[in-house]
Amino acid sequence: MNRFKLSLLALIASLSVSTMGASIDHIQNYSAEYGGNPAQQGAINVGSTVYFNPAGLMRLENGTYIVGGIQYAFGDQNMSQGGRDFSTNLSSPIPNFALYKKTDDGAYFWTMGGVGGGAELEYKDSIPLSVNLLGNSIDFNKFLSNTHVKGSNIYAQTTLGKAFNLTDKWSASLAVRGVYGKRTLKANATVDKNVNIGDLIGKPLLRIPIFREGTASIDSEREAYGFGGQFGLNYAPNDRLNIGFRYDTKVKMKFKTKSDINDNTYGQSINIPGMSIPSLGVSDALLGLYPVYKDGEKLRRDLPALAALGASYKVTEQWTTFVGGNYYFNESATMDRIGKTNVDYKNGWEISVGSEYWFTPQIAWLVGFNYADTGAPDKSFAATEYALNSTMLGTGVKYRPNETVEWTVAFNHYIYDSRTVNDIKYEKEISSIGINFVKKF
């Protein structure tokens, strides 16, 4: 029977997904400029280097810089099974802020913004609830009504550090990172009439209620704080080529759950030859026995380490090209467990290319491409999330009205690979638009 409970729980938990995840919980859209050109790992510019290549700050002009922006993600996510669609629209603002001061002796920097998670997802008309029970495939949506599920998953990060020159060509950066994570889940369902075990296994004369007529609901919130480090290197062998590297350490995060469960659907325990089932309520099947959402539960779900490497090359005075990649060390991170079951995540990776062309000293055009392999195995789709591989296409415009101000507006679209796991087809389609502002003093 535990397998039955956990199967339903896994489907409910699919709400906790990263909206534009590069790999599992991670996102990379730290600034709007990423939306127009995601290959920022080796870039030198005033609006995004502080986020993606902080060691490269030593290649900028001396001064104090303030960076601020916001991105707005929108789209839909869809699960389908047996000809029925379970979809939700999403919308999410993603703000970013940075302050840094560059001198000949070094650069001090501070950033704030999103580092993982995504938008709130709300399924107003249930989700797939087909479960294998005692050799039969049971669609529990036939017995439940008013099933409503809403979940969110947000990680915010602040970084404080310093960049400094090693030689006239090499520079480095060191920083500390603080991460706050919050994952919420609300669910409710109604049992319209008693659900007998005989109805589930094709023996209508066995009229023992496994669920009774009633309602069940859960309101769960998980929070965690964690700290990590960040190390960077930048190499500029000449005026045209620049190579950047950044390593973000794993952030250990122990989530503590506060949960309020109300359930009057508990059925009768069953103990007959060949069948032993304890008294159950819908909350048990949905969430109650899932350790992640039990009140007072403390479980690790780390933010995995990340290595980023990239380069930029100035082809002409007006045109710069970019290439970069990220590698996510998911296998070394401790993730949520369902009882004693652990999902073996694979390491994830991304590759990006981009271009920036200045038509005039005031206006530039950005364009870029990114492919992400999340490292999420099929098994995870029946556990805690569905992190689909994706292709991102982006474009944008930079505007410099004078030497101390820069605006960036960008748009991107994510094309996700659909995947079918246990007869459930998972799909996403997400876009975002963003604006970024830089002021130099």
Label every PLM stretch briefly:
Residues V17-E120, T384-Y386:
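N-terminal, post-signal peptide beta-strand-biased segments of exported outer-membrane/organellar beta-barrel
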Residues S80-D85, K142-H148, G214-S220, Y293-E297, ...:
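Extracellular loop and loop/strand-boundary signature of outer-membrane beta-barrel proteins
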Residues T64, D105-Y108, K169-A172, R240-I243, ...:
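Repeated loop/turn-to-beta-strand initiation elements of outer-membrane beta-barrel proteins
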Residues V397-P401, K428-F441:
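Outer-membrane beta-barrel "beta-signal"
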Residues M58, K101-T103, K162-F164, F231, ...:
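Residue-level signature of outer-membrane beta-barrel architecture
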Residues K124-S145, R183-D219, F255-G296, A333-N342:
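Solvent-exposed loop segments that connect transmembrane elements
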Residues G68-Y72, W110-G114, L174-Y180, F245-T249, ...:
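Transmembrane beta-barrel strands of outer-membrane/channel proteins
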Residues S48-V50, N89-P95, S152-T158, E223-G229, ...:
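Residues that define the transmembrane beta-barrel architecture of outer-membrane proteins
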